[in-house]
Regions:
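Membrane-water interface of transmembrane alpha-helices
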Residues: 49-63, 137-140
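Active-site recognition of the HExxH zinc-binding catalytic motif
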Residues: 39-55, 91
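Generic serine detector
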Residues: 25, 54-57, 96, 105
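Active-site scaffold of zinc-dependent metalloenzymes
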Residues: 1-35, 52, 63-65, 99
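Hydrophobic, membrane-facing alpha-helical anchors
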Residues: 40-45, 66-72
Length: 164
């Protein structure tokens, strides 16, 4: 929640420029809304690519749990611990860290209003990644030994030693 609060503060700090930009270009408002809505599918797609398997594999399962307000993607098969850790971290690295570095470095230097919108989107995405970090990443780092295989079976995750 603190990141979402920071995002709102950043957005409100630039509200005059943002409002003017939306007024000047109504398509910018539509693009901003579509971009925010596209964050969840993009996040799950980056997870899919990070499994380093075909995104069209029958073992790749995409779903939603509306009651809990979450979407998920999992690979129904054993994977090495390092690959699961990569899969968990990938959306944060691609959709939060990379754009933030581009904003800070000046590589991505749009108008202040667009910059505020991008920062708002990045901070919101970072907040949305907390489920990945708090639930999955932390539990794997704490409980699964290096070199182990991890297998999701339904809502249960198992791990075991690699077979030689």
């Amino acid at each position: 929640m603190p990141l979402i609060a920071v995002a709102v503060v950043v957005f409100l700090a630039e509200r005059v420029q943002v409002k003017a930009a939306f007024h000047e270009s109504p398509l910018l408002l539509a693009a901003f809304i579509m971009g925010m809505l596209a964050l969840v599918p993009a996040h799950e797609f980056v997870h899919a690519l990070a499994y380093l398997k075909s995104p069209f594999s029958r073992r790749l399962i995409v779903g939603a749990w509306p009651r809990h307000g979450m979407c998920y993607l999992l690979y129904d098969g054993p994977l090495p611990r390092w690959r699961v850790l990569l899969m968990v971290a990938a959306p944060f690295l691609v959709l939060s860290v990379a754009p933030m570095l581009a904003l800070w470095s000046g590589v991505l230097a749009p108008r202040p209003a667009v910059r505020a919108m991008l920062l708002f989107a990045v901070l919101n995405h970072t907040a949305l990644c907390m489920g990945d970090y708090c639930i999955v990443l932390w539990r794997i780092l704490r409980n699964v030994p290096r070199g182990a295989l991890i297998h999701n079976a339904g809502w249960t995750t198992y791990w075991g030693a690699k077979r030689l």
